[in-house]
Amino acid sequence: MKTDINRRDFLKRAGSAALAMGGVAAVAGCKGGETSASAGTEEKAGGGEMTYRTNNGNGDKVSILGYGCMRWPMIKDENGKDIIDQETTDRLIDYAIEHGVNYFDTAPVYLQGQSEAATGRSLKRYPRDSYFIATKLSNFSNASLENSIEMYRNSLRNLQTDYIDYYLLHSLSGLEAFNSRFGESGIMDFLQKEREAGRIRNLGFSFHGSPEGFDELMALHEKYHWDFVQIQLNYVDWTHASGRNANAKYLQEELDKRGIQSVIMGPLLGGRLSKVPQH
């Protein structure tokens, strides 16, 4: 197996998935290609290759490109089971870090539950203060308080860390989804206490839904003080989101009104907006 990875190999593995190396634009506000006032200041790395945005809440310097960890390369084990190729994953993360990426986004449900552990093993080789981890409370099948707390604690174990930089309520569409998975169980009280204790550095949610659903969640900001929100934003979704989904322009403007910074998912629309040339 190759012991190094070049830019073309990296883009073929990562860029085509549109969740790796460009799947998350971290802590950024965007308006038609311009940086919004809520996005914080920008600065270049020493080599000028990566731009960083400042988290206005705590001063984190976050790379404008993050690494989505939903599509790590897979191989078969001796029993024919699909498992993450840890060696290649390590090399991909090494390449990303070498080129200034410091934000890594995963979730308990990614890759049949394998993503967090593989990501944690790779990142453990680096100083903890040199990168930011984002993961999610993906309590879709069992939203009980006990299960939600265990999922959160299991994320800490899998990621081999004692705190999470950016923690998201996974895939909210509005108040009904929020109440059924988070509002009624008491988990929000627990998560707020974890934030106060520093084990969650930033608390927010990822969103897929209508403008009305987003308005409902924005109405909760005074109570829960969202530190950030993850939205899908690209040049198609900016004003032509599919179905009943809210346009990204509307979502970003509503966040800007409240001074909430955004993290971007799907800037390449699952790879459909980008092709890696063969030459």
Spell out what each predicted region is.
Residues 2-131, 190:
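N-terminal binding-site loop/beta-alpha segment at the start of enzyme catalytic domains
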Residues 52, 93, 116, 120, ...:
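Generic structural signal for well-ordered alpha-helices
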Residues 62-66, 103, 130-134, 163-166, ...:
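Structural preference for beta-strand elements that scaffold enzyme active sites
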Residues 82-95, 144-158, 212-219:
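Short, acidic/polar
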Residues 124-131, 159-160, 195-200, 223-225:
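Short helix-capping segments at alpha-helix termini
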Residues 126-145, 149, 170-171:
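Structural motif corresponding to the early beta-alpha repeats
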Residues 159-177:
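Active-site groove signature of glycoside hydrolases
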Residues 172-279:
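Beta/alpha (TIM)-barrel catalytic core signal, keyed to glycine-rich beta->alpha loops juxtaposed to Asp/Glu
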